[in-house]
């Protein structure tokens, strides 16, 4: 069977590789056979001006192999002179760019293809993030039901969500009020993610700043309903860091601080008056500090840290395999914050 590629481009280490798992897996605690080919070769074309390098990359979304969207928390200004330890990404200098060291809010959104060639840089929107004091933009998503393929950007620090046209020419929707946190029908507090329903409605994971809720909104952005609460019970949240939809419209909500994934089943019929209605089903455990989840037809992938790793789950909640990422050397990782898959099953 031809092995898929695992194109890694996310995390505070901020570099891109394709990794050959069978060779690397001797030291990576793989459970079960891996279908991925993992080769430690540079992948992403660099485009930063002299004296600058990538920032902390927080989001990726693969529309197709010819159009892959990336979100970075600004770029990083390099010291002068550049230390010999510099290997093309800030973590090689021992920097955690999430803390903002050397950050310049520029080239936040860009588009590349599966060869790592940069196609577009959306610097016309950098002004939305200038002056941000904190992690800033957190996640990129796109609805599989949207014929316009609009790009959704969740800005955690500014409590706001932006929706752009696919070519970056228009800002088509804004949800929340920039810099104003809250817990009502129009405000969020550190929103983390969005997920999409077949009828155009969407869900907002509003759960890192104590709100501990998932907000349901109509296709036009108006408020519909919400569910979720904080607490120690298995169905309650400590945080809602990532959302993903799976088969049968099940919702998978990743709780970073409880270190688990909560699964909710859809109990209402599409287009009925009580749609959507989610009922807690089960919780997946066995994680250390999970950050993102993505679903396929028969499996789920979770990025986890402590140590940095990727975990594959079967949809019954059992772990299929786990592999750790290198934490030393030229391809080291501090964390992998997000991942996305293309039409051939390659993970980015």
Language-model regions, residue ranges each:
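Bacterial N-terminal signal peptides
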Residues: 9-20
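Eukaryotic scaffold repeat domains enriched in small/polar residues
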Residues: 24-348
């Amino acid at each position: 069977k031809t092995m898929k590629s695992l194109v890694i481009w996310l995390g505070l280490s901020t570099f891109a590789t394709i990794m050959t798992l069978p060779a690397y897996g001797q030291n990576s605690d793989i459970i079960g056979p891996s279908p991925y080919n993992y080769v430690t070769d540079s992948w992403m074309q660099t485009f930063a001006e002299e004296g600058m390098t990538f920032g902390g990359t927080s989001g990726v979304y693969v529309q197709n192999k010819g159009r892959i969207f990336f979100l970075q928390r600004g770029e990083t200004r390099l010291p002068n002179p550049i230390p010999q330890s510099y290997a093309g990404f800030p973590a090689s200098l021992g920097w955690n760019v999430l803390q903002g060291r050397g950050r310049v809010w520029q080239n936040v959104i860009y588009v590349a293809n599966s060869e790592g060639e940069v196609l577009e840089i959306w610097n016309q929107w950098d002004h939305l993030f200038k002056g941000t004091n904190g992690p800033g933009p957190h996640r990129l998503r796109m609805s599989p039901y949207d014929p316009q393929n609009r790009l959704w950007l969740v800005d955690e620090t500014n409590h706001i969500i932006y929706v752009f046209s696919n070519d970056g020419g228009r800002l088509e929707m804004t949800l929340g009020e920039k810099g104003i946190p809250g817990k009502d029908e129009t405000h969020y507090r550190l929103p983390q993610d969005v997920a999409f329903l077949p009828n155009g409605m969407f869900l907002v994971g509003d759960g890192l700043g104590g709100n501990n809720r998932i907000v349901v909104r109509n296709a036009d952005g108006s408020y519909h309903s919400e569910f979720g609460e904080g607490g120690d019970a298995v169905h309650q949240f400590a945080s809602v860091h990532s959302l993903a939809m799976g088969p049968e419209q099940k919702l998978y909500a990743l709780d970073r601080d409880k270190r688990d994934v909560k699964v909710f089943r859809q109990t209402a019929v599409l287009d009925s008056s009580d749609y959507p209605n989610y009922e807690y089903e089960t919780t997946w455990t066995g994680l250390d500090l999970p950050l993102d989840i993505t679903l396929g037809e028969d499996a789920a992938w979770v990025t986890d840290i402590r140590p940095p790793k990727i975990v594959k789950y079967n949809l019954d909640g059992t772990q299929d395999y786990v592999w750790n990422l290198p934490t030393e050397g030229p391809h080291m990782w501090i964390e992998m914050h997000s991942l996305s898959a293309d039409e051939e099953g390659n993970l980015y």
